[in-house]
UniProtKB/Swiss-Prot annotation:
Superkingdom of this protein's organism: Archaea
Binding residue positions for NAD(+): G6, S7, G8, R9, V10, G11, D31, N93, T116, T117, N118
GO cellular component: cytoplasm
A Pfam family matched in the record: Ldh_1_C
InterPro entries, per database record: L-lactate/malate_DH (IPR001557), Lactate/malate_DH_C (IPR022383), Lactate/malate_DH_N (IPR001236), Lactate_DH/Glyco_Ohase_4_C (IPR015955), Malate_DH_type3 (IPR011275), NAD(P)-bd_dom_sf (IPR036291)
Record-listed E.C. numbers: 1.1.1.37
Gene field: mdh
Annotated active site: H173 (proton acceptor)
The protein's name in its UniProt record: Malate dehydrogenase
GO terms of biological process kind: carboxylic acid metabolic process; tricarboxylic acid cycle
Family that this chain belongs to: Belongs to the LDH/MDH superfamily.
Amino acid sequence: MITIIGSGRVGTAAAVIMGLMKLDNKILLIDIVKGLPQGEALDMNHMSSILGLDVEYVGSNEYKDIEGSDLIIVTAGLPRKPGMTREQLLEANAKIVAEIGREIKKYAPDSIVILTTNPLDAMTYVMWKATGFPRERVIGFSGVLDAGRLAFYAAKKLGISPASILPIVLGQHGESMFPVPSKSYVHGVPLSKLLTEEQLKEVVEETVKAGARITELRGFSSNWGPGAGLAIMAEAVKRDAKRALIASVVLQGEYGVRDVPVEVPIILGRSGVVKVLEVELTEEERQKFMQSVEAVKKLVASVPPSYLQ
């Protein structure tokens, strides 16, 4: 059973896409708002019936119902509003994530957790501490979205399909994340050789500011991109795909970093993170990466200790 905690725009988008991909025959929606997950589940069941899908959606306000879940997606948290930085969300969302983490530990101690709550990397750390799970089973969703955005903007410049690009984005999911054009390839040729310096600068800027741009345009943050990315990650777990993708995980010596979650390439399968892939970086790229690590460290250091137990 797949459980999605949080029945807002991202959670419901993920639920719909996962159902269309037939990743499980039961998808549980959890939310603290009475009636919300039940109503969403009923609507999705009608969709499932119309499309002939063998997928049952169930809505609940009780954490005890997550028992038996092998994969839990956490999208709960305060939304990012126009002009708000991810850092401003820290304290309020740390409390929410810590509470959810304790419930997961109680009712689904063998599950794999993927979360989207911002600021993402710091919340991944909070979830890791709150559950007490191995780092392989607590994964921050961000990199699939960031990499997808990089591929989209680069493909527009090149006039090719985004599917032709293997993108790499590293560091913090936020203002200090950095796409790596020298390690992002089109059939073995790096983007840094296919695009001019000015084009690369534009692609990187568009990628970094994409989330804020969506919020600015429509007044609320992205949901379809994250929903699709979550479904891709869920597929890797449920089908043991051993898929290479970008995600935020707690590093344990990789890149010379310990006990800090940041976006890096991983191999994802049924057991969670199978392997963290270490990309060879130039000195300049290494400096940018470490700047991101330091930014995450500062956020983690500002989380109240009571949320890390």
